[in-house]
Amino acid sequence: MFKNKVVWIIIAIVAILFFWVKGVYNNMVTQDEGVKTAWSQVENQYQRRMDLIPNLVNTVKGYAAHEKETLEGVVNSRAEATKTTIDPSNLTEESLKKFQSAQGELGNALSRLMLVLERYPDLKANQNFMELQAQLEGTENRISVERKRFNEVA
C-alpha cells in the first residue's frame, strides 16, 4: 500500500513538472513571436520612410538644383540604410546597433535636407511637397511609437 502511494505521488510530481515546463516553453515561444512581430512593425515604418524619400528628392530637385550635395547625402544614406537589414529570428545587440546607426544617418540626412529647404519659399508652397513632408513627419512619429512598443516587448 505504501509503495502504491509513493508511485502515485511521483507520477503526480512528474505530471506537474511536465505541465509547468510546457507552460514556460509556450510562454517563451509567445514572447519570441511578440518580439518578432514588434520588430516587423518597426521595419515596416522604416520601409515606409524609405519609400517616401525618392518622391521627396524628385520634388525637391526642381526647386533646389544647386543643393546637390544635400540631396546626394539623402540618397546615399537611404542606400546605406536599405543595405542594412536584420533577421527577426536573429536579433542581436550588434545587429540592432548597426541597423539603428544606418537609420540614424538617414534621419540626420533628412533633417539637414529639411533645414536647407527652409530657404525655398516656392517649394514650401508646392502641394506635393507639403503632402510628402506631412507623410514623412507622420512616418517619423510612427517609427518612434513602434520602436517604443518593440522596446517594451523585448
Region spans (language model):
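A helix-centric hydrophobic-segment signal that preferentially recognizes long
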Residues: M1-A154
